[in-house]
Amino acid sequence: MDLKMDRIAVGARFKLSEIGRIRCPDLADKVGVVVAIGHRTTGITVLFDGAQRPTVLHRDYIKTNL
């Protein structure tokens, strides 16, 4: 199991990491909450503040240390 995966928990607040801001510039300034973690994939399901539907992002695209 990846060590970074251990630090990401459901309910954790997050913002995009540096690589996430480069890859997803439209989401660069948004913050949200982790709603699900894929244990078999690299996908993390997140809900951005103000959004109605969740989004799946690669775990390297988010950082939970606000």
What are these regions (language model features)?
Residues 3, 7-66:
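Basic/aromatic-rich interaction segments and small domains that mediate binding to polyanionic partners
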